[in-house]
Amino acid sequence: MIDRSGPALVHAWLGAMYLDGADGLIGWIDLDPAVRPPRDNGSRDVEIVLETGALEPGPVLDAHVGACAARIRDALERLPGLTRYALEHAPAGWAGYYAGQPGPPLPDRLFLDGIRVSEQLLVSLDFDAGELDQLTLRLGHEGAAERVFLTP
């Protein structure tokens, strides 16, 4: 449950981050349309979820959030290539099904909806293609694309 009574911390780039349960933070950043087109309603936000474990507010948590922000920025700088990787390595049948649906080409429909960073600083990019399931791309410790899977 998100505690919206006030931010748990405010990061210089990520902005206000709110408690998300006992071991996480959640926030939203606006992305430049050059990085990712806005949502259908014009909103430029992307959800950011950071796993923090049992870290208490203070310098250690601040350092963790800073490291998460650096990982997110790195992934966003490489977003076009990571998006291609996600499409090329999507589960069998998934890309074929979506490519056959009416509308723009699949690469243009794959929409970065959220970014998660684990306690171990592993980044996951959650892409929406307009249906219920999301296509998730997990990056490894060095930031390279590692695994693509569906999440409900």
Where are these predicted regions, by residue range?
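Amphipathic protein-protein interaction modules
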Residues: 63-130
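N-terminal "domain-start" segment
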Residues: 1-87
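Acidic, proline/glycine-rich low-complexity IDRs
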Residues: 1-29, 33-39, 101-152
